[in-house]
Amino acid sequence: MSKINLLLLCGGGSAEHDISLMSANYFETSLAKSEQFSVLRVELDKFGQYRTAAGDDCELTNSREIRFRDESKTPWPVDYVIPCIHGYPGETGDIQSYFNLIQLPYFGCESEASSNCFNKITAKMWFSALGIPNTPYIFLNQFDDAAIEQTQAALAQWGSIFVKAASQGSSVGCYKVDDSDKVAGVLKDAFGYAPYVIVEKTIKARELEVAVYEYNGEVVATVPGEIICDTNTFYTFDEKYAKNSKARTDVVAQHVSAEISEQIRAYAIKAFKGMKLRHLSRIDFFLTADNEILLNEINTFPGSTPISMFPKMLQNHGHDFTEYLSLVINGQLTAKS
């Protein structure tokens, strides 16, 4: 049986470029455990240039093959692609649109679902439409005096707020604000990352995460895990990835009742199905001291670094990551043929 030529595409050039490379390491190691795949790892930079791990400049063509700048190298036909790209252009849905155009099968959520989840404003509209509780918010479409006034009013009403660039991941462009004098500066910074900004009420709560993925035709939601941050901090980019991070992750959240756990899992599956996600996601919730459950955000291509929760929760649920990838890829290619 011939091997599947699998393109492992990583990087992307966004603020999460280096994290994407770390995740790609995990995918590459997992795929190497199967004899089904011939894997070519290619990094995409912020200028849209492709380069193999061996340093060869190349491009993905409309004919679904990798062509090398060195024309003496034989083009490499691509059967399947894993876009291991956090942020733009992967989680934004842009690169999936291109794959659809050239009819190249790919791993992960499709273009529209990716875009809807990546934009925090659009995502919250979907959460509300699906009847899933989420945090109170306002959104802003330009940086001006009116935006500053609206944000200061929200701060006065809620006591503490988060100002977030609407289309960034890994807490990029995300700021906790308790002082009205800082509103203008924070808004200016947030608008530097995205054309839209969302302002949310700060919720004092536990941060719980659920891995939701497709396995043998079923949508699976794991028991919630938990992010435990250092005192008076939130889960910033540095807290997520710095070697000296004081944040802790528990694959299984402690002291969560079976009833609450099941409700969180039910909301997660409802969001996955309702927003037509595919293959994988990590869905994050807040759990308040009063046991109020609030959907925070959905990550359509969760990190797979050594400290990332998605692969740990999948494994804890009893599923092997390599087998999971094989099932998804083979099922998709069989359906296509």
From Swiss-Prot:
Pfam families: Dala_Dala_lig_C (PF07478), Dala_Dala_lig_N (PF01820). Coiled coil: none annotated. Keywords: ATP-binding, Cell shape, Cell wall biogenesis/degradation, Cytoplasm, Ligase, Magnesium, Manganese, Metal-binding, Nucleotide-binding, Peptidoglycan synthesis. Residues 124-330 form the ATP-grasp domain. Belongs to the D-alanine--D-alanine ligase family. GO terms for molecular function: ATP binding; D-alanine-D-alanine ligase activity; metal ion binding. Pathway: Cell wall biogenesis; peptidoglycan biosynthesis. This is D-alanine--D-alanine ligase. Binds 2 magnesium or manganese ions per subunit. ATP binds at residues 154-209. Its main location: cytoplasm. Mg(2+) 2 binds at residues 297, 299. Cell wall formation. GO terms for cellular component: cytosol. GO terms for biological process: cell wall organization; peptidoglycan biosynthetic process; regulation of cell shape. NCBIfam families: D_ala_D_alaTIGR, PRK01966.1-3, PRK01966.1-4. SUPFAM superfamilies: Glutathione synthetase ATP-binding domain-like, PreATP-grasp domain. Mg(2+) 1 binds at residues 284, 297. Its cofactor is Mg(2+); Mn(2+). Its EC number is 6.3.2.4. It catalyses: 2 D-alanine + ATP = D-alanyl-D-alanine + ADP + phosphate + H(+). PANTHER family: D-ALANINE--D-ALANINE LIGASE, D-ALANINE--D-ALANINE LIGASE A. It is found in: Cytoplasm.
